Amino acid sequence: MAIMVDPPNGMGNQGKYYYSMWQTLFEIDTKYVPIKPIGRGAYGIVCSSINRETNEKVAIKKIHNVFDNRVDALRTLRELKLLRHLRHENVIALKDIMMPVHRRSFKDVYLVYELMDTDLHQIIKSPQGLSNDHCQYFLFQLLRGLKYLHSAEILHRDLKPGNLLVNANCDLKICDFGLARTNSSKGQFMTEYVVTRWYRAPELLLCCDNYGTSIDVWSVGCIFAELLGRKPIFPGTECLNQLKLIVNVLGTMSESDLEFIDNPKARRYIKSLPYTPGVPLASMYPHAHPLAIDLLQKMLIFDPTKRISVTEALEHPYMSPLYDPSANPPAQVPIDLDIDENISADMIREMMWHEMLHYHPEVVAAMSAR
């Protein structure tokens, strides 16, 4: 539970209350009443809370010492810039970023999201039964949210069950945009680490430089297979093992299936693997609907140029009971996520401050009145 505590050194800041959760100090705006901690990760701690002004339940994520690690700081800044623009019922909503007291020296960031009950990883590993309707509805919502992102030229690049939040109504929302980039970006971001290995597309495993939205579709296919089978389809131990597991299921590739590989060494490796006929997905998931298997096969195609797109997946017969094209408008404008990777920590801090101002017009008004 959240325990109210005295401020550090007995010196509290106006407009802030202090709470201890899991031996971590939270300095949060007085309008929020924390309930209990609900999650912990490398980034920090998440607690559930109530907004006194609206009576709405929210999730507060504290990112501790965000500037200690430059990569984490840039990830956080990108997520703030992106979520300010995104408005879709299958994408998590960032409702507030708490203003720190000291503009030039703050170390922690407090993000306020809509509150969800669990995530798809927890559901998959639970004993709770999942019907065809459950699997279909989760996949539909994931594809809807992803179609919206792709319409804004955004690649998520880290889709996995743990990044898909779910509530008691089975509503699903995509979260964690720290690795997201614009599809138009070129250069160094294309070769850096992306996507948790088990959900990583072949073109990433093979170090192809020019990838696009199809990497997210592969991840969706892996997630859908995990929903159907209640375990990861390709639980590789390292990169080469990951490729072997994929080929063992899909079967040995034809010459035309390898044309997209622009790395000669990578192409030689795939060709060196022993011949395998593959394993029919219908035999791996014998209880799945035949149309579900057909769609899964189209998402898990080795060659990204032949893989189904998000829009095509939504138009697949398996989705026809749920999909209404007129109810899925695209994002309004493409979003610019390009940030100079070499900017100083002070500049990242200043850019975060300006992102916070979008949620606090009262601070902007006070600054203008000076």
UniProtKB/Swiss-Prot annotation:
Position of sequence motif TXY: 191-193
Catalytic activity: L-seryl-[protein] + ATP = O-phospho-L-seryl-[protein] + ADP + H(+); L-threonyl-[protein] + ATP = O-phospho-L-threonyl-[protein] + ADP + H(+)
Description of post-translational modifications: Dually phosphorylated on Thr-191 and Tyr-193, which activates the enzyme.
Record-annotated active site: D158 (proton acceptor)
Protein kinase domain sequence ranges: 32-319
GO CC annotation: cytoplasm; nucleus
Keywords: ATP-binding, Kinase, Nucleotide-binding, Phosphoprotein, Serine/threonine-protein kinase, Transferase
Activity: how regulated: Activated by threonine and tyrosine phosphorylation.
GO biological process terms on file: intracellular signal transduction
Top-level taxon of origin: Eukaryota
GO molecular function, one term: MAP kinase activity
UniProt protein name: Mitogen-activated protein kinase 3
Species: Oryza sativa subsp. japonica (Rice)
